Design a protein with these regions (language model features):
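Surface polyanion/phosphate-binding segment centered on an Asp-His-Pro turn
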Residues: 237-260
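Conserved beta strand-loop-helix elements of the APE1-like EEP
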Residues: 61-76, 199, 210-232, 258-259
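N-terminal, active-site-proximal structural segment of metallo-dependent hydrolase catalytic domains
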Residues: 1-52, 62-65, 155
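Catalytic metal-binding/acid-base residues of hydrolase active sites
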Residues: 9, 36, 109-111, 152-154, ...
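Active-site-proximal beta-strand elements of phosphoester/diester hydrolases
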Residues: 1-10, 102-117, 148, 251
């Protein structure tokens, strides 16, 4: 079983890349972020020939998340309690039966935070506080939960191209990292880092000339699995090929494979 997360950065612009990716990788579940379209303008018709169910929480021009799944959802949730950004489409959860058991699958697009000290940065921290509180309710029920998304936080020095240059800049501050570690310490694992403890790879590069070619990136896209999913994990890796295609997203997919 294969679960993928990908910040597609406009599904309209990247529709052909999406179709090719689905055909090549054949994921069981694909979590998308930054689809940048309203729910009713999601390309349902253009993808209707594919063997998937489509769950969408869209927003005009900005944000937007979706879950594309071979398995039908029993329940769909489009927000969590006290979400600071409840007016923005940044969260989508489905509950469904999978080969590894009944699961909660979450597609998350965390806010960037603008610059350190700004109102948006403070709001980002509040978003994380409330998301952490929401996850704690799942832990109390011992539910299987997998979160995929653009977290807009690089966890450790190994996850950025230059810790010195990026020190205490947005997405790489100690206070942001503490929020992410609170999630990890509450019973979740960063599946890529679990499989590759010392490997340096990135999931995002600025579009500015040379950033991808010079590998000046950050690893801010992740799949987190709660502890009761780890025994099923086979591998977790990234697909660099999509960043070399024409009109790519600035993010690449993160792929986790599980035993059936």
């Amino acid at each position: 079983m294969k679960i993928v997360t990908w910040n597609i950065n406009s599904i309209k612009t990247r529709l052909n890349l999406l179709r090719n990716f689905l055909s090549k990788e054949n994921p069981d579940i694909l979590l998308l972020q930054e689809i940048k379209c309203e729910t009713e303008k999601f390309p349902f018709d253009e993808l209707s020939d594919l063997p998937y169910n489509f769950y969408v929480h869209g927003q005009k021009s900005y944000n937007g998340v979706a879950i594309i799944s071979k398995f039908p959802a029993d329940e769909i949730i489009k927000d969590f309690p006290n979400n600071y950004y409840s007016d923005q489409a940044r969260f989508l959860e489905i509950k469904l039966s999978l080969p590894i058991g009944f699961c909660n699958i979450i597609s998350l697009y965390a806010p960037n935070g603008s610059f350190v000290g700004s109102d948006k940065f403070v709001a980002k921290l509040a978003f994380y506080d409330n998301f952490i509180n929401y996850l704690s309710t799942k832990k109390s029920f011992d539910e299987k939960t997998i979160i995929g998304g653009d977290f807009n936080i690089a966890p450790f020095d190994i996850d950025v191209y230059s810790p010195k240059l990026l020190a205490e800049t947005t997405c790489f501050t100690e206070i942001e990292q503490k929020k992410l570690r609170t999630i990890l310490n509450s019973g979740f694992e960063d599946l890529y880092r679990l499989m590759h403890p010392c490997k340096q790879e990135f999931s995002w590069w600025d579009y500015r000339a040379g950033c991808f070619e010079q590998n000046k990136g950050m690893r801010i896209d992740m799949i987190l699995g709660c502890n009761n999913t780890i025994d099923y994990l086979e591998n977790c890796y990234m697909d660099y090929n999509l960043r070399t295609q024409e009109k790519p997203s600035d993010h690449i997919p993160v792929i986790a494979s599980f035993k059936k």
